[in-house]
């Protein structure tokens, strides 16, 4: 396993380590407010293609509940779709997750949310400054 600074690492697979641009992409998404598990799953799906939950756990070095939360967020943003694959024998069918577009297309919802957050913060600052200037406080 390859451990990178700030614990934004992806699991090293087949002797291939995560590149610096991949780590920068993940850390930048996290700085924008994206949950780390969500960013890791998005990038793992981009790098490794359609993957099961177990594969995402291994490639992203995260636990199953974290994969589920990340996939739910990615589905909410409509950047991931899932296909059921019949299990061999008994049990629940497993799901294969894949991106709905290119990485560039899939990061758009995250950028839009970050820009909306910026607008909200700027508006709140302006309101706060206006309220603080009034003489009736």
Which positions does each model-derived feature cover?
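N-terminal helix-turn-helix DNA-binding core of bacterial DNA-binding proteins
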Residues: 29-62
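N-terminal leader segment of winged-helix/HTH proteins
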Residues: 1-32, 87-88
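Short, cationic-aromatic polyanion-contact patches
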Residues: 28-37, 52, 85-108
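Amphipathic alpha-helical dimerization/coiled-coil segments
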Residues: 102-137
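Glycine-centered, phosphate/nucleic-acid-interacting loop/turn motifs that mediate DNA/RNA or nucleotide
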Residues: 78, 84
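Basic amphipathic alpha-helical segments that dock to polyanions
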Residues: 45, 56, 67-77
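Short Asp/Glu-rich motifs
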Residues: 48, 76, 93-94
């Amino acid at each position: 396993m390859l451990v990178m600074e700030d614990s934004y690492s992806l699991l090293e697979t087949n002797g291939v380590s995560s590149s610096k641009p991949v780590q920068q992409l993940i850390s930048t998404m996290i700085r924008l407010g994206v949950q780390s598990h969500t960013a890791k799953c998005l990038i793992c799906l981009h790098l490794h293609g359609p993957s099961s939950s177990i594969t995402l756990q291994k490639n992203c070095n995260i636990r199953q509940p974290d994969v589920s939360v990340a996939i739910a967020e990615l589905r909410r943003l409509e950047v991931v779709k899932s296909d059921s694959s019949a299990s061999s024998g008994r049990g629940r069918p497993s799901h294969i997750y894949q991106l709905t577009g290119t990485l560039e297309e899939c990061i758009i919802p995250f950028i839009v949310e970050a820009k909306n957050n910026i607008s909200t913060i700027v508006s709140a600052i302006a309101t706060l400054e206006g309220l603080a200037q009034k003489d009736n406080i």
